[in-house]
Curated annotation (Swiss-Prot):
The modification N6-methyllysine is found at residue 277. It comes from Macaca mulatta (Rhesus macaque). Residues 61-71, 419-434 have a biased composition (Polar residues). InterPro entries: MAP2/MAP4/Tau (IPR027324), MAP_tubulin-bd_rpt (IPR001084), Tau (IPR002955). This is Microtubule-associated protein tau. The modification Phosphotyrosine is found at residues 18, 29, 215, 412. The modification N-acetylalanine is found at residue 2. Tau/MAP repeats lie at residues 262-292, 293-323, 324-354, 355-386. It is a peripheral membrane protein. The modification Phosphothreonine is found at residues 69, 71, 111, 153, 169, 175, 181, 223, 230, 235, 249, 421, 445. The modification Omega-N-methylarginine is found at residues 155, 367. PROSITE patterns: TAU_MAP_1 (PS00229), TAU_MAP_2 (PS51491). Residues 1-274, 416-435 are annotated as: Disordered.
Amino acid sequence: MAEPRQEFDVMEDHAGTYGLGDRKDQEGYTMLQDQEGDTDAGLKESPLQTPAEDGSEELGSETSDAKSTPTAEDVTAPLVDERAPGEQAAAQPHMEIPEGTTAEEAGIGDTPSLEDEAAGHVTQARMVSKSKDGTGSDDKKAKGADGKTKIATPRGAAPPGQKGQANATRIPAKTPPAPKTPPSSATKQVQRKPPPAEPTSERGEPPKSGDRSGYSSPGSPGTPGSRSRTPSLPTPPAREPKKVAVVRTPPKSPSSAKSRLQTAPVPMPDLKNVKSKIGSTENLKHQPGGGKVQIINKKLDLSNVQSKCGSKDNIKHVPGGGSVQIVYKPVDLSKVTSKCGSLGNIHHKPGGGQVEVKSEKLDFKDRVQSKIGSLDNITHVPGGGNKKIETHKLTFRENAKAKTDHGAEIVYKSPVVSGDTSPRHLSNVSSTGSIDMVDSPQLATLADEVSASLAKQGL
């Protein structure tokens, strides 16, 4: 049941895209025109659907972002469980659409509100991009919010924590709008609307994921979580020729790449039939030939061996040098002549050989004379030899004078004891001092001591 709804949703989104292709530069006018189309279709709701000024819109966006991204089973679950009996009866023909029929053949294209809903998707995405860039005004935000609530009205009243907001945007494209919807469910859907838009809508281009597939929720457009459900419901190839204007493919997410690249498991290789490389198993039992070599010890037969170079032929050969005999004969020297006539003078004696040395005792006293007449003057006495050297003791002390005339008479007492014991007066000493030695016995004794000490020193 999920695949027919996928086809119908893609067809409706392309219809909205073709109808709004010439209104890219008139975003304000497109928004007002879509607003009026929604009002004519009978989808106008009570004033409770407008976003509140006290921040309830931001609160709803935060709660919707916290929810996990629903799977394909969660997308189809609200169609069966959460709707009223009247809505299930109205939605039953859309579940039965075969894959090969178009919307016009099934009778769905006559519904006046389907294209308006697709246009409301585009207007809503553009309004979100305007509010993200900061160029949109408050009244445009209110109009975008009204358009979202009108798109979300066909869904039954569901608790806020039961399904993600992505289901709210996918269900209206598959089921016709119901005029009777409780205001409380529309208010809850308004509170879940977050403001961000895709980065490509800032350049004036319609958002790719919102215009084409309609799977991305207004709470998280362009995020990997909102696009992860796209490859799980592939579009049949019968709807590909309908894409005439621009082929827009949603950006691939890591989860979608993993789901598409699910290859068949590789079978295990048959290890029994594996052939060895380079024929290694063929020679597995090969034994090297060197192991079978036997060393046989045989005695050599040397009887027929011939010597090299004919050495055996001369084995009994005796060298000729062995028979040489050395004969010793005495030499006859009688007939030998001396060289240079030496034999003729064999008895010659040298002339000096007959000289005789005689030793005779010489009488020097009688015959020998002294040279230069030295013997004649043997008794000579030198001329000064008879002179005698007389030694006289000098008595210079008696004649000595004092360098300074102190006026005293120096009495010299000769160390030689003589009979004359009277002191002798120096003749050279002046006696002007008139000091009498007899009168002063101390001076006399002093002079004697001085003279005695000088005499001892040898002066």
